Amino acid sequence: TRIHKMGMKFGLWFEPEMVNPKSKLYEQHPEYAIQIKGRKPSLGRNQLVLDLCNKEVRTYIYDQIKDVLDHAQIDFVKWDMNRHITDMYSSFVPNQGMFFHQYILGLYEILSKITQEYPNLMIETCSSGGNRYDLGMLYYSPQIWASDNTDPIERLAIQERLSYLYPQSTISAHVSLAPHAQTLRRTPLATRFNVAS
């Protein structure tokens, strides 16, 4: 690709656990979304969450990602999940108290297949910041986005506390603009680079 010819690596940002209610997928398979029977599904960010407890959904997600990875020279994937799961029900889980556990096992299954099929692919996971920062996710992705707060001074505290349990190499960070969009703090570019690295 042109990116590789420039000496860089190419990455894509995915949010594969979501579905838009106006999408072809949802129109053809509304049962793929998590929803409580007899209730209108709860939207967040104009999205519904796909039911990873459902084997068909896991296969669909894997096949879609595989199609992209097979037709592009992708080195890096950022796997994001930006909304809360509000309709906690799946007809594929006999004990609804196990819903979240089964959902995450479904996610692990997809990530396992991807990492086995594409061992050189770098995956960074993210969930509205660091909501999935745990050893289970690190098994499949050696980097996790720690927080959506990218102000370097704020990040010092976030990254310090994460370092009590996790290696620094697992903490993903970006260099942000100054003044920072959330805190309006101005910091030198060198500080922003030092904290992000």
Regions found by a protein language model. Give the residues of each.
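Glycine-rich tight-turn/loop motif centered on a GG-T
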Residues: 1, 31-33, 37, 91-103
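Active-site-proximal beta-alpha loop/turn segments in soluble metabolic enzymes
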Residues: 46-51, 87-98
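Hydrophobic faces of well-ordered beta-strands that scaffold small-molecule active sites
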Residues: 10-14, 77-79, 124-125
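Alpha-helical scaffolding segments of alpha/beta enzyme cores, especially the outer helices
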Residues: 2-5, 63, 67, 106-113
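Conserved structural scaffold segments of CAZyme catalytic domains across common CAZy folds
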Residues: 1-11, 17-24
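Glycan-recognition surfaces
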Residues: 20-59, 104-197
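An active-site-proximal structural segment forming one wall of the substrate-binding cleft
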Residues: 50-80
